[in-house]
């Protein structure tokens, strides 16, 4: 597999990584319709764990079948497919080598009571990812949660193991819990902070939600206003989040968020493009 100058430039930012990890990143970046451009779209399918099967798949019954999601990622020309252990296992042989996969190694469910201390359980490991031929592991952290430190400690250990065997690391960094307000979960100061924490934890690919213009923290508001940090447009906010990830030296993917019509999806994609993000991860089936 040859790589393009755009992909080579991205890989050069990961100065400490071994050839195995860089090869797996290259597989993701060279896959699909955006292959070689430095942009990517990841299909994450962990809704069944998060919300239950009926809420996730009943509107589109073929989606109950794990093979559907592999096929969707392939037919749509996406960059990678991310899912929990059972979903990857169910299609690992049939689709081996056809689409880069990201094993989601922690998960949560909507039955738990945890408004101030949301967390996720570790549900798979690095050896599972190797056994299934995955290119990366994926892990969610909840900055702001009363259990955030435990989650950070877990991913620090998992990331070290993954990198040692040549796997890439994807961190979903979704602020929630603790003293954060609901609008604060997507506030620009909080999103940028959460993305920066994921970079500090060693993520190769960082996934956050598209930020709003809201500023949650009074201390941050003084800095944003005093330094005249531009957060007026979606593109300027994306640019600031990317800047917060080592000035663009890490791949930043933005969640697709709530379901949108075609115009809404295109507008969001343009903002991410104009802000220097590496595109979106869609979560709807």
Summary of predicted features, one role per range:
Residues 283-285:
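Conserved small/polar residues in nucleotide/adenosyl-binding loops
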Residues 1-2, 35, 40, 47-252, ...:
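Alpha/beta enzyme core
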Residues 257-263:
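A C-terminal functional module that forms or caps the active site or interfaces directly
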Residues 1-46:
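N-terminal basic, low-complexity leaders that serve as flexible interaction/assembly modules and, when applicable
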């Amino acid at each position: 597999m040859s790589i393009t100058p755009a992909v080579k430039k991205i890989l050069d930012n990961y100065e400490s990584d071994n050839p195995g990890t860089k090869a797996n990143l290259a597989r993701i970046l060279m896959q699909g319709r955006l292959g070689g451009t430095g942009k990517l779209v990841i299909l994450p399918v962990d809704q069944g764990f998060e919300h239950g099967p009926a809420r996730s798949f009943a509107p589109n019954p073929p989606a109950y079948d794990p093979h559907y999601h592999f096929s969707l990622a392939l037919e749509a020309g996406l960059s990678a497919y991310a899912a929990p252990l059972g979903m990857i296992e169910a299609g690992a042989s049939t689709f081996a080598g056809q689409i880069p996969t990201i094993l989601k190694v922690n998960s949560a469910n909507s039955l738990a009571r945890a408004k101030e201390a949301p967390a996720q359980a570790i549900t798979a490991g690095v050896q599972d990812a190797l056994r299934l031929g995955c290119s990366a592991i994926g892990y969610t952290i909840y900055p702001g949660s009363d259990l955030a430190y435990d989650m950070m400690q877990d991913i620090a250990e998992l990331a070290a193991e993954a990198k040692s065997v040549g796997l890439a690391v994807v961190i979903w960094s979704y602020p929630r819990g603790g003293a954060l307000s609901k609008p604060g979960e997507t506030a620009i100061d909080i999103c940028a902070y959460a993305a920066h924490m994921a970079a500090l934890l060693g993520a190769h690919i960082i996934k956050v939600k598209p930020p709003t213009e809201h500023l949650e923290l009074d201390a941050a508001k003084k800095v944003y206003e005093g330094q005249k940090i531009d957060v007026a447009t979606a593109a300027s906010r994306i640019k600031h989040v990317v800047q917060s990830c080592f000035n663009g030296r890490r791949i930043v993917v933005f969640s697709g968020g709530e379901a949108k019509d075609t115009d809404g999806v295109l507008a969001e994609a343009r903002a991410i493009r104009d802000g220097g993000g590496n595109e979106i991860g869609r979560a709807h089936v």
